[in-house]
Every structure is written in C-alpha cells, then in structure tokens.
Amino acid sequence: MKYLGQSDYQHATAPRIGVLLTNLGTPEAPTTKALKPYLKQFLWDPRVVEVPRPIWWLILNGIILNTRPKRSAEAYRMVWSDRGSPLLAHLEDQVAGVSANLTSQHGDRFVVRGAMRYGTPAIADVLSEMFDAGIQKLVVLPLYPQYGGPTTGSTFDEVSSDLTRRRWLPALRFISSYHDDPRYIGAVADSIRSHWELHGRADKLILSYHGMPKRYLTEGDPYHCQCHKTSRLIGQALGLAESEMITTFQSRFGREEWLQPYTDETLETLPDDGVTAVQVVCPGFSADCLETIEEIGMENRDTFLEAGGSRYEYIPCLNAQSRHVEALTDLISDEINGWLDHPQDPGETDQLARELGAPQ
C-alpha cells in the first residue's frame, strides 16, 4: 500500500490545528439523478442499516433505489434555496462562525472546515485539503449532540478510514457527544425562550429526535438515553414540569420497530386528549434540513391540524445562532487545551533542520 505523504512539507511552516465540523450529508441537487448515488452511499453504510449485506444489497438495489430517489427529490425541492441544500448552507455558516471565534481567541493557527459524511464535500477530500494547509493536530466535531452509531460512529469510521491511508498521522481528538453540555443546553433553552417571547407558549412542547431501530438500543447504543437526558435538562432550564413536554422520535422507515413514541403518531392523537396547541423543537439536529423543514415543519403540521389541532409551531434549529456558535467554539477550545501551550518558532525549527541536512 502506498501511503499519502506531504511531499511539499517545509520546516519553516508553522504547524496548524485542524478543526473539522461534520454533518450527515446532502445530494448535489434536488433531482432523482442526484439522489440515487447519495442514497446509495448513505443506505449502504452498515452503521446505518445493520442487515446482512447480500440481503440488503438485493433490497437496496432492487427496490429502494428504484423508488425512493424520485420521492426524496420532490421533498428536497421543497426546501432547496438559492444557496442549495439548507444543511450545507448552515454548515458553511457554522464553520465561518467557529473559525472567526477561534481566530479571535487564539490567533491565526486554525484551519476550520466542514464536511459531510455522505455526498459532498466529502470527509476524505476535506481532510486532504486540511493536511495540505499544514495541520498537524486535528479536532473532529460531528454535529450530532447525542451519540449514535449510525451518525457519530459512522463519522469516526470514515475519518479513521482516511487516516489509515496517511503516512503522518495528526494528534487526534474526537468529540463523540455533547448532549448534556451546559452551553449546548443553554443555547437550546434560549432559542425556545426567544420563540415564547414572540409567540407565547403552547399546551405542550414536543422534543422530536431522529429515530433509530429499537434493537440498536437493546444492543448497547446510548442514543436513546442521551436524548432523554437532553430533554430533561432542557426542561429543567426552562422550568417545565414533565407533563408540559413530550420526547418523541421521527423519520422511521421500514417495517422494524423503532424508538417510540413516534412523533407523527403522537401528534395525531394529542387533539383527542385535549391538546390543541403544540410547539415542536428538534434538539438532536444542529441545523435545519429536510427532516426538520419538510417532515416536522410541513408534513407533521398537516398531521396535527387534520387530527383536530388548532395551533402548530415549529421552533427552528440552532443553525448559526451566535449562542450556538459560541457553544461549539467552547467545546473545541476544551479539546485543544494543552495544544496551545508550547508554540514552535518555525524559523528556529527551519534553522535546526537545515543544520541536520534538510533540503534548502
């Protein structure tokens, strides 16, 4: 195997710290043609679908990829903007904000980039760019507050896979979750309070998280527990009683049982229980995307109103809100503690290297 090196390395170049923010992914366009390879990459990941590969290959290529891309493209067209995918646009804004904060706090020593686990910009491509920019230390922050094997775990797999190809490995720190970090909890609570100041409160606050098959929980994935802890801490920050909020799970597909209660079924039954006004927030999503804008903001709104509800409000994700960007910056600063204590003088390093016979 030929390992990737840095043939243009210069001793006079000051080493830099890389910060990689990642999210799930997005197709390149809201078209059937673009959705097919994106969904194929996403759904073929064994972290996402834990089914024996031969069986799943037949289902994926024989059924799903011949039907789902068209439906997904129609949904993506509803949320696409002038900047393209909302998830990618928000990631770009988050990267810009974190980069500005780190530079302001610690100087121009950082290479901050964003990447997607599926689609583009791909993790491997972005890491190559970062190594070319001279990073020798790397912090990876998957933008999933709650750890899940299909999300955070898969991100680690992809980063690790890329690093196995490299001759010079960086010092590496990987943030696996921040579901109970007070700065993140505070940012979510502030966002909800701001919504209440403008619109008042509803009968119930629904905290909807992306779902996953129930057997992942029984086999040891901590995602379900971390979601409930996040909800509890948000409720405490807002001073809510347990009866004033509900934790639910959305976006299930297939016939297997997923984490419950399901968001759509909960919204469908609440009016019969006398709950006619709800506000929905998605604390497991760091940025608005198809699952929040279309599924929660549109589809589930219709479900609730058609079931007899009278008021439905979706509270947007944190996206690039300043409090959120500050929380992300602080998480990263915690991880680089110690990396900034011993700055190298590139001039001295270059001189010493030349004395040992390094190329001029």
Regions from the language model: what does each represent?
Residues 1-360:
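Active-site-proximal alpha-helix that buttresses catalytic centers in soluble enzyme cores
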